[in-house]
Structure formats: structure tokens, C-alpha cells
Amino acid sequence: MKKLFSLIALIGSFAFGQIKPIQIDPINNNLFVYQTFNSFNGVEYNANGMYLVTNKGIVLFDVPWQKSQYEELNDMLLEKYNLPVVAVFATHSHDDRAGDLSFYNDLNIPTYATSLTNSKLKKEGKATSKFEIELGKTYKFGNEKFVVEYFGEGHTSDNVVVWFPKYKVLNGGCLIKGADAVNLGYTGEANVVEWPKTVHKLVAKHPTIKQVI
């Protein structure tokens, strides 16, 4: 059921330690994947964030993996659409998802995370979101809608997904791994027993999914 999303090929080579540029690829005219990079145990990984373009502004789902790219992404989106980022939703507490929400809080951009994610962030001495996600609520921003849902533990105890009913697209975050994934990535906070059960619940809830990111 999971359809792999084709990302823009990386062009050229980069010196050791240099941050790879943000890669953006469309799902449709309003929904996009953006890809950032980091390494874990000497292996390079990508992180797929998403953003939704509405007539009131851009909703960001997860932050760039590198904090140095937060402002870069904001500027890219403003230049491309002439619209500001109007909200940031974090799908769990890790650096490639919630990162450092203080950047957005300081810009008075509304930030959202679940109570569990915020408790994890607070425990780690990191900035928490300004608003708490209401799971199952249909969020409306301009002409677009989406729902943030929790089906159980997997990659982390707080991993949530985002459902875009108009497009039948699911942002699975780190809960969903691509068919080409060679491993589960970081499992230090994972519940590998419950993980497949959680995914099964998700699929049962959304049998009409057209695309998973």
C-alpha cells in the first residue's frame, strides 16, 4: 500500500561535513515533501518533512533536521509562494521532527505538539510547543484541512501521523518506513513489539490511502 515518493536526485558532490541542501518535491499543487539530511552511527539518513500551501499561509509538518536550515526553509517558502509559515506541527520529539521549536516560538509562529511530545521535550530541556495538538480534530487553515492521529507506539511512544482527507495522503512520519529501508533506523526509544500492531491499526482506519510519505 505504501507508495514510495520519488525525491529529487542529489546533484554533485559535497565536502565532508557540509550540510546538503533542502530538497523539495511536490505531491500535488498544495502538498509537498521536503527532505533534509543527517547521519547516525556513520550512516547518512534523510528525513521527510512536509508542508501544506493554503490561501492563508503555509503549514509546516516537522522541522529541518539541521537547525541552521530553519531560517533557510522559511525564506525559501516565502520567496516561492509569497506566503509566510503560519503554523508548525511536530510529529514527535526527535531533532528531525520537533527540533528546537524556540526558533518558531520567537517568531510568533504557532507551534503544535502533543502533550506527550511536550513532556519529552521539557524533560530534555528543549522548547515546547505553544499549543497542544488535539488528536482526531480536523484542523482548518484557509482552504485546507487535515487531521493529526495517534495509533500507538512504534518508532517512539509519541509518534503521530497526519491525514489529508481531500488528497487521501498520509504523513506517516518516522512510524512508516519505506520498502527500501535497510533497517528501522534509530530504535533507542522504539517499541518494536507494538510497532507492527500500530501500523495495522492505521491501515485499518484508512483503507483508502493513495499515498504514504
Go through the PLM ranges and name each one:
Residues 55-57, 68-112, 207-210:
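Active-site metal-binding motif and surrounding structural segment of the metallo-beta-lactamase
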Residues 46, 67-69, 93-99, 119-121, ...:
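Active-site environment of divalent metal-dependent phosphoester hydrolases
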